[in-house]
């Protein structure tokens, strides 16, 4: 979706395999949630 702010998680390490785990880590960082993104499967948090 256009217009959504995403930033790379600071606490998530390794390949992002599940959106649920990524979202949990992002919420722990104070973001709204997150998901795995891109070819390199990085955890991106929604701000």
Curated annotation (Swiss-Prot):
SMART domains: Knot1 (SM00505). InterPro entries: Defensin_plant (IPR008176), Scorpion_toxin-like (IPR003614), Scorpion_toxin-like_sf (IPR036574). It comes from the Eukaryota. SUPFAM superfamilies: Scorpion toxin-like. Gene3D superfamilies: Knottin, scorpion toxin-like. Disulfide bonds join 5-47, 16-36, 22-43, 26-45. One of its GO terms (biological process) is defense response to bacterium. Fabatins have antibacterial activity against Gram-positive and Gram-negative bacteria. High activity against P.aeruginosa. No activity against S.cerevisiae and C.albicans. Belongs to the DEFL family. This is Defensin-like protein 1. It comes from Vicia faba (Broad bean). The lineage of its organism: Eukaryota, Viridiplantae, Streptophyta, Embryophyta, Tracheophyta.
């Amino acid at each position: 979706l256009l217009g959504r702010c995403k930033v790379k998680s600071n606490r998530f390490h390794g390949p992002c395999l599940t959106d649920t785990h990524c979202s949990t880590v992002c919420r722990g960082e104070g973001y709204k949630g997150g998901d795995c993104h891109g070819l390199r499967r990085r955890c991106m948090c929604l701000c």
